[in-house]
């Protein structure tokens, strides 16, 4: 993505998105949240436009969030998965993309287990491609909604100590947050087991810790990642009990952070493993608000990439 209007541009990740573009999306998301909170959530901003949610991996939050985002904006939205399409009959990924393109689809929101699948799609077909998570690569809209959630509680992201805790190695959420937060001026700290948080990550402008207490000390934000048990080799991971004891976030550890610390989690949570239930549902937690904010942020992304503008034209 370059600077200026986002109309017609793909959102594949935050690595190549400018701080100005991030600010644009977050500012428009503020207006979209007013729609989300209103009694009449249906607006005609994308009337006549068609969006396909092509999810090759299971999803509850992201797919539902994108579906509601499109429908709230007045678009026609279709959800596709391998089991519910000709992909289940052996149709190739490329042919599926071509079919959707020939039908006149305006945008394809895509989740895929293969890193780089959304980039491939941009070279194969014409519709706007929005990455809803590709392997362990990136998940840009999750990072955008995380930053939006921070800005609702803090005046600015610049200068904040943001701790990302857990399975960094397998986390597309972590990568997008690292790219986005560092561009917005945050001091990003990563923490977790040595098998999941490599020192080489410091090349991205972050600080790496293998002691959770050291990492959380004086933190403004603690973003706890889900332990992706389905992706983890046993050699990389201790027992659940050991992980919870050493790296799980609980009230005892959270006391080391600032008094107004925010606790975040992209979901779904493994309560009692990476995060204690009393922390997940504490006053410091904004986890449920993240879900609501996700709809507003994805509305902003769909509007800006399909229609363009800078938000000043929106009467909300």
Regions found by a protein language model. Give the residues of each.
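Glycine-rich phosphate/diphosphate-binding loop of Rossmann-like nucleotide-binding domains
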Residues: 56-68, 152-225
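Positively charged, low-complexity intrinsically disordered leader regions
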Residues: 1-68
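Adenosine-phosphate binding glycine-rich loop
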Residues: 260-261, 266-316
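Phosphate-coordination loops involved in phosphoryl transfer and adenosine-cofactor binding
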Residues: 46-51, 158-162, 260
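Rossmann-like adenosine-cofactor binding region
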Residues: 201-278
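Short, structured coil segments at secondary-structure junctions
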Residues: 73, 124-126, 184, 202-204, ...
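Phosphate/diphosphate ligand-binding glycine-rich loop within oxidoreductases
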Residues: 40-151, 271
